[in-house]
Amino acid sequence: MRRKNRLFILVVLLGIVLVVYYSQLNSLDLVEPVQSSSSGNGGCWSYYEGLTPGWLNDFYDVNQITPNPAKDVIELVTRIKIFFNCLQQVDGHNIQRLRDIEKKLFPYINFEKLETDESAFWHTTTRWNGEVYHASMLEFDPKNHQFLRSKPINFDTGLSFWENWLHTVTQSGSKGIVISASDVQLNETIRLLKVLRFIKNDYPIQIVHNADLSQDSMKSIIKYARSLDTAEYPAQELWFLNVHSLLNPKYSKKFTTYSNKWLALTFSSFEIPILMDSDTVPFVSIEKFYELEEFQKTGVLFFKDRVISDDLFESSELKILREIVYGCIGLDLEDESKIHEQVEDPVVAQVLENMFIKKYKHHLESGLVILHKGKHLFSMLTSIALQFSPIAEYFHGDKDFFWLGELLSNNRFTFHPVDASNIGQLGNVVSKESTGEFYQICSVQLSHTDRDGSLLWLNGGLNICKKTSWEYDYEHRQRLNDMFQNADELREYYASPVKLEGIIIPDTSISGWINSGECFLFNYCTLFKEGEFGKLIKFKEDEKLRLSQIVDIWNKDI
């Protein structure tokens, strides 16, 4: 009888714990992450023992059909989340069990090589002067960011791989610029480095590649990053990081194009990297990005994408995404009022409304991202799992998996609050009905401004159109056919420098982003009408001069 009473009491207590836990989830506050509760070493890790034998957080192939995508994604995310919580809450691990779980959670890591030939597993980093550092942790001065020394990686077999990565491979608090580049991005990478020199960047730079950057390309990059060193145009502290050996050969080739950015962000030597696309152009000091309020509060810096109202989710896709969010964090996204009741951060709440109520697909612009890996590593690993999950085809590239990984991990994040903007040459719109200023900007460049209207950065390079679409556009776009004599003339125009005269932040509730159909569908137009819609920022003459200098440097022949 006593045994039955004890059992009854245990069941009741467990029920109370579950009720409290799920009530926390259902009143989700994205500013304060909720950690799942567990007690005891065995109780935490035993979750994995109850999984279907042979389970694996495998990569899904494009268009791979799965009968229950929501269930599959919830399981992917939950396995990573519980692993992270167990590491936080349990002292002393069964190392063999830990290793077995890691291999299944992160199959893209070459754990077999780590166990059988550790030296061959570790990555190689090459400095601009030819110095090669293998299996080493790099240390930089936290004040002037100069390289200090390297230390051999001392892998602690009593810790998980990712704990080792944070504590024995990565210098605590280190900051720097990370660029994912292969031979394909050579020219754009060089142009970005020239701009970084112009703005007098003093942070170290790592070019991360998956054995797809040739020695000749590295020599060219070094030349443009280091030659003619002056106070006004300082040489850059440049490093090349080859991560190929870290990857399971079965998965290495799956990291292509934009998905290579996950490798750069994850395996860079810096704990707090600022990730840039090769066609990103910063206009302020790198320190300015680290100082932005959103990063200071959350440890991540995300910028908004264009609000595109004509590229929408299918209702069936949103149904699955709602199931995933509810299954992972208990957030009900069925209507607008519930979203704003449950989510404290108004910027995040608006993004969720745009996605789940208005069906918009594009929310985050990943041309520049900062992520504190000490605070957000497992959210980022969740993002990687999502990138190769059944919902990958719902989204365009890597962009929105950055914030979705944070959301489904229930981690603290937000967006820079200023909407994305269009930058370029101001065109007067002739209207009999309008007496005030009426402007249009059409460009491929997506710009981002601070609260005071100052230009922070843009994505898309600094020529008219970087896409090789001039022949198609000349044949299919009447406007361009009328403007140019032939496709070769259009090609020259596309290669010419942009003119940065102003910025329009459109009022998307009245007049949003309009795709012109030009430049491989990357050209968008926005409107500003004084007193009616949009926000206009006109550059003053001194600012135009500075911007034109950056445009000239970026476009100079290589």
Curated annotation (Swiss-Prot):
Membrane topology (Cytoplasmic): 1-6
Glycosylated residues (UniProt): N187
Membrane spanning residue stretches: 7-27
UniProt topological domain (Lumenal) ranges: 28-558
Domain of life: Eukaryota
Top-level class of the enzyme under EC nomenclature: transferase
Name of the protein in question: Alpha-1,3-mannosyltransferase MNT2
Annotated organism of origin: Saccharomyces cerevisiae (strain ATCC 204508 / S288c) (Baker's yeast)
Highest classification ranks of the organism: Eukaryota, Fungi, Dikarya, Ascomycota, Saccharomycotina
Gene designation per UniProt: MNT2
